[in-house]
């Protein structure tokens, strides 16, 4: 059926945030200070520590943070993580319901049960955040993650562990590492794996000591012949790195995968800050036990604040194949990614890496690290890539947090999931951005499909798509604006951003148009994923790709934002999108993955069999032609590993 009426505006929208650029003088002074300290030959972790650390015999003891029980329907903002020296881990601190409401929505068990995903990775219960140390080893994909075994809120962080043959179906293993040493007493935090040429595995991770100092530690498999890597040994000489002079005790975390230098040494980078300037410290090592702090920084950007979960890797300029982290040369670009502690988004820049100068230089300073491009313009943070030597590709994982209330998370007993793993490669058509795309293996979950060819959507119309259910979907769609509309539409200097536009209800001559997902029949709840096109003064089209959650739920204790950004659409290309819908998660990819948006959606009516999918066109002038293929998606097999009696239980 077709509704010939435009989408209605909503009452309020979240205001966008911005970061202020600071003077570079402080950074230069800080660099001079750091350089003077290492000029004599480099700081070595085996020397005298420059941060106060308590030994294993210290009497200093601190209790673990325990999950908070919320027995009533009253809920209040609670900060988690900041006091310990990491980014805010509670969405409650960021909002208090619409209109400042402190009463939680009366969620029932049916609603909360529906929110749990069916083919995204998550533990059986409790809290999860950053992906850690992903790798392919002896026939298994290994995935480690930040995990609280004691509740559905951040705290008591250890390393969870799971394995898979295809990164879709997962088997949970026993915890890999727990907080049992003085140097990680307050948490076994984020880390990365490096596989050496001889097959040896090196795992570096951040530990929060019994005095909340962030230090770097070394671990390795107890039995390298074990394909499941069940047991891990922590190096007896931990910590191998402590904060250098001038760096705060809580501003030194998340070591990267190591890469080989031209001198044959291994090199890592670690995120930090000087005042409000984000920086990446660089260390060289030959044995992963003793390190040299290199003079200068890999990159520093004023105004970006603390850099978490730094990632650094090469991409090919010629094809889509992945590259080992150590590859460099004329046919290679490098990608530097940082997770900004201040706004909890993942930013990346593409540029060149000088091995001798230990310096990354972005191709476009306007798209520098932390101020330009993002991996994902929705809820996607603390991401980590790895080189998959099994299929010659680079794989990206990202943490998808919750945007409901902590009360609801505690009630349902779990919080957070991981994104569907994505392949990452350079967009060789533009040369200025990455392409992200769900791994091919996810297509093994496709069931029956419905195809819709050349559907016409007139201005201000909503068209129902007749499919079975709309809770677990893989949708591929293409859209075209009729030529007559493009030619007669006046050129405009209209300013448009997804986050401040008013959402899908904001009508323009050439947009918005796209899909309404997780919608109920009466459209009291719906989430638009759409394109908005502006014809500029020179006749060129400027396209934005957005996801609008402002009418996604009737609940008052969920965050309803509008996400998105500009997406390049090249001459001759149709507007294209792909969506993975998995209950409360919608992952959207525009133009082959040039721009990606992940949303958390918590409907109260558009659930189970009541969920619908619609085509919509809220433009005032353009008629849109759409062609879609919609697959129902099966559930992934995610369960505990079926150990034999002689295996670890």
Swiss-Prot record:
The active site is at residue 130. Keywords: Disulfide bond, Glycoprotein, Glycosidase, Hydrolase, Membrane, Signal-anchor, Transmembrane, Transmembrane helix, Vacuole, Zymogen. It is a single-pass type II membrane protein. Substrate binds at residues 127-130, 146, 154, 189-190, 253-254, 308, 341. It catalyses: Hydrolysis of terminal non-reducing beta-D-fructofuranoside residues in beta-D-fructofuranosides. PROSITE patterns: GLYCOSYL_HYDROL_F32. Residues 1-101 form a propeptide. GO terms for cellular component: membrane; vacuolar lumen. Residues 52-75 are annotated as: Disordered. The chain crosses the membrane at residues 23-43. Induction: Regulation of synthesis appears to be related to the growth of seedlings. Residues 54-72 have a biased composition (Polar residues). Pathway: Glycan biosynthesis; sucrose metabolism. SMART domains: Glyco_32. Glycans are attached at residues 210, 275, 618. Disulfide bonds join 498-546. Residues 1-22 are cytoplasmic. Pfam families: Glyco_hydro_32C (PF08244), Glyco_hydro_32N (PF00251), INV_N (PF11837). Possible role in the continued mobilization of sucrose to sink organs. Belongs to the glycosyl hydrolase 32 family. This is Acid beta-fructofuranosidase. The gene is INVA.
